[in-house]
Amino acid sequence: MIYAMSDIHGCLRELKDKMTQVDLQGDNRLIFLGDYMDYGINSFKVLQYIWELQKNYGDEKVIVLKGNHEQMFLDWINDFRNPYADGSAESILFYEWLETDFEHGANTLRTFISEEQINFLKQIARTCSWESISREAVQMILSDHDEMIWWMQHLPLYYETDAQIFVHAGVDEAAGEYWSFGTSENTLLGKFPAAKGKFYKTVIAGHVGTGTWGLANDRHFHDIFYDGESHYYIDGSVYKHGKLLLLGYDEKNNRYYQIENSRQIPVKKFERFR
């Protein structure tokens, strides 16, 4: 069995609950498709849990891909990791990650540093620029979590089997079998709208909530979306609705399942009126 999860977004309780339904014995594998952070209240703990899981089982059994939210965070880290660097055009863009996080109560940052450090950053925010605050915050993170940041930076962008492509957002399908050469990082991490239709391999992705426009177009739909051709989407918007999706692929019978309460529910083509 190949399991897949995506877009956990700091929801640790839901992740731990879903993991009770994953069996990693034998040749079974688990693939995480990215976006482990932001929105939820436990970004660091989710990353730590997945990192430890991979260390315990190995990176051939637990495959961890990078999502666009990890990349945005890492872009911010990389722009400000030198405390003496002048703000570049890129850093002026990426300090917006911190500004956005502060607008949401520093929901992600506070999971990486102490409350005392958060209060210090809030205090200097009254008089300092976002560039200066970013440099301070990045040094705080690196002082305690440099190894985790290194791990995050080296996460792959896709995982390929003989019949499937697991990726955070999607690939350039116009490139056909040369997709791995023709797909940009921006597409792998942020493709929108979600692709549908026939492709020579099955694409399993997250990034786009399954109930959103272009997929189910139904705000009450939070199950796995299958287009009936070559695409499975597994982002159930857990941070909004509390439902983390778990896909299971049985390599023996070539069937896909949505795993709920340890039940394997066959995934069928989405029909708007069913």
Question: In which residue ranges do the predicted regions lie?
Answer:
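Feature recognizes metal-dependent phosphohydrolase scaffolds
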Residues: M1-R274
